[in-house]
Amino acid sequence: MKKSFIAAALFLAVSFSALAQDSPKMSRDEYAGRYEMLVKRLGPEGVGIETLLQKWGKDYPEDMDMLLGKFTYYLSKSRKPELVQKEGSRYLGNAPALTLKDSLDRDVNYFQVDNYDGELFRQAIEAIDKAIEVSPLRLDCRLYKISALIGAEKESP
């Protein structure tokens, strides 16, 4: 009885010490695979993606896939679409998302407008700026930044 108690206590002590140690560092491919799986199942701003991106950023701070993932996450998280009533048949180059009739049988147009949370948008821009700094010859990163800025400014191109 005493031997089995000691064996059980020893087993628990070894188990807890193993849990207390940091898990081994994942490779870039493992992070990328996990990120792709989460985005595929939960969308670009799903639960757990921010935590994964933070861990990935600590282990590989200049990884392009991680930086683009952060940009996508924070940009998606910052975007808040809403319907607004506007005069005219087009707004910022877009057709109305919804058209209703008022009491005088006139068309009332509603357009989808994306508003952005300033802090989350700033984090997205910081991520894409870091990606541009790491790989200045990648034009796609510059185009992502330009598109995000145009969207946030609500200017018709």
Language model feature labels by segment:
Residues 40, 55-59, 126-133:
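Conserved structural position within tetratricopeptide repeats
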Residues 18-50, 57, 83-98:
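Sec-dependent signal peptide cleavage junction
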Residues 63-66, 136-141:
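Residue-level recognition of tetratricopeptide repeat
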Residues 1-28:
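Bacterial Sec-dependent N-terminal signal peptides
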Residues 29, 73-130, 134-137, 144, ...:
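Short coil/linker segments at helix-helix boundaries
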Residues 46-54, 122-129:
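Repeat-mediated protein-protein interaction surfaces in helical alpha-solenoids
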Residues 34-38, 56, 70, 77, ...:
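Structural register within alpha-helical repeat arrays
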